[in-house]
From Swiss-Prot:
Known function: Catalyzes the ferrous insertion into protoporphyrin IX.
Name of the protein in its database record: Ferrochelatase
Pathway terms, separated by semicolons: Porphyrin-containing compound metabolism; protoheme biosynthesis; protoheme from protoporphyrin-IX: step 1/1
InterPro entries the UniProt entry points to: Ferrochelatase (IPR001015), Ferrochelatase_AS (IPR019772), Ferrochelatase_C (IPR033644), Ferrochelatase_N (IPR033659)
Catalytic class of the enzyme: lyase
GO process annotations (BP): heme biosynthetic process
GO molecular function annotations of the record: ferrochelatase activity; metal ion binding
Major site of localization recorded for this protein: cytoplasm
Keywords: Cytoplasm, Heme biosynthesis, Iron, Lyase, Metal-binding, Porphyrin biosynthesis
Taxonomic lineage of the native organism: Bacteria, Bacillati, Cyanobacteriota, Cyanophyceae, Nostocales
Catalysed transformations (reactions): heme b + 2 H(+) = protoporphyrin IX + Fe(2+)
Length: 388
């Protein structure tokens, strides 16, 4: 078959406190995170937002040791995957490509070309597809493939989502069962699935299949678990007053507390590695909300990380992908006919003198409004939570 490679995609995270500001800048520079009518405004606005949010984010990272463990865990997953693939008879080089921090996806691609990889499996470490996670990485890779001639000879295939993979479901069920056994009455514990949220408009206007895949994944895990426990699905990490997928995790915890739930185990359903949203948001912030709501026995299921059943599931995904017809980045970026990846081309105005004059006037008004908001502490960006 030739030299085989596997590219693991993930979000990335700051390794130390000094990295938080640059990481946030990279995050908000992504048009899939903040969409603006003028592309050249993206980076200045990203710099302003990152500058305002850095201190608060650093405090959160201090609570989990001063940095994100995501890179370390992802690299460990890669090493375990390489070993398991070898055990199953498939030798492969493993590469890690992060979207917003080192090692960047571009760095991984450079190494892939240097290593003369002939067959590549692109595997996002997001079980469920969303335009803001896997979709953003796929758009970047598609752009790199179009611009870099050295990538053209590589036969590649994409795994867009894999939440139905039996091994993944089994790993999640085993982790939940182990945590349930820590309670005096395991069958009476309420199972609380918490997924990373996205704005509701992503689903209703852009056709993002994320909510459907999360709901299906929850049902499949409960079916695999085969326990009588009641369960709830909620969405965390909402920012600002814009409506996101509901119910919100914080509200759902309060409601369960009001209903008299005392024993609860949280399942981070959209995360396969420990990071800020599991270690700080769930373990610290939501634990406090739960306890204040009367839920006194609060536990969390660990992320799969390098769980052997989970790693074997990833290996099976890779082997199956190599056997089946290739799935291209252009297909992955448009998984459904209705999915709109918000191409920035729609905002490119003609470069006429008149257009440039109006563009300049609008930009000036925008910057003036931004400066006024930064000085006064009030305005649209504060309302939606991008400035604090």
């Amino acid at each position: 078959m030739g030299r085989v490679g596997v590219l693991l995609l993930n979000l990335g995270g700051p390794d130390k406190l000094e990295d938080v500001g640059p990481f946030l800048y990279n995050l908000f520079s992504d048009p899939e995170i903040i969409r603006l009518p003028f592309r050249w405004l993206q980076k200045p606005l990203a710099w302003f937002i990152a500058s305002r949010r850095t201190r608060t984010s650093q405090q959160n990272y201090k609570q989990i040791g001063g940095g994100s463990p995501l890179r370390r865990i992802t690299e460990a997953q890669g090493e375990a995957l390489k070993k398991q693939l070898g055990y199953l008879g498939q030798e492969a080089n493993i590469y890690v490509g992060m979207r917003y921090w080192h090692p960047y996806t571009e760095e991984a691609i450079a190494q892939i070309t240097q290593d003369n990889i002939e067959h590549l499996v692109i595997l996002p470490l997001y079980p469920q597809f969303s335009i803001s996670t896997s979709g953003s990485s796929f758009r970047l890779l598609d752009k790199l493939w179009q611009e870099e001639p050295k990538l053209q000879p590589i036969e590649y295939t994409v795994i867009p989502s894999w939440y139905k993979q039996p091994g993944y479901l089994q790993a999640m069920a085993e982790l939940i069962a182990q945590e349930l056994e820590q309670f005096p009455n395991p069958d009476e514990v309420h199972i609380f699935f918490s997924a990373h949220g996205v704005p509701k408009s992503y689903v209703e206007e852009a056709g993002d299949p994320y909510q459907q895949e999360i709901e299906e994944c929850t049902a499949l895990i409960m079916q695999t678990l085969n326990r009588p426990n009641a369960h709830t699905l909620a969405y965390q990490s909402r920012v600002g007053p814009v409506e996101w997928l509901q119910p919100y995790t914080e509200d759902a915890l309060k409601e369960l507390g009001a209903q008299g739930v005392k024993d609860l185990v949280v399942v981070p359903i959209s995360f396969v590695s420990e990071h800020i949203e599991t270690l700080q948001e769930i373990d610290i912030e939501y634990r406090e909300v739960a306890e204040e709501s009367g839920i006194h026995n609060f536990r969390r299921v660990p992320a799969p990380n390098t769980h052997p059943v989970f790693i074997n599931a990833l290996a099976e995904l890779v082997i199956d992908a190599l056997k089946n017809p290739s799935f291209k980045l252009s297909q992955a970026a448009q998984m459904k006919k209705m999915v709109k990846m918000y191409p920035q081309e729609r905002w490119e105005w003609g470069l006429t003198t008149s257009a440039e004059v109006w563009n300049g006037r609008i930009a000036m008004l925008g910057f003036i409004a931004l400066i006024i908001e930064l000085i006064t502490g009030h305005g649209f960006l504060h309302m939606i939570g991008l400035l604090q």
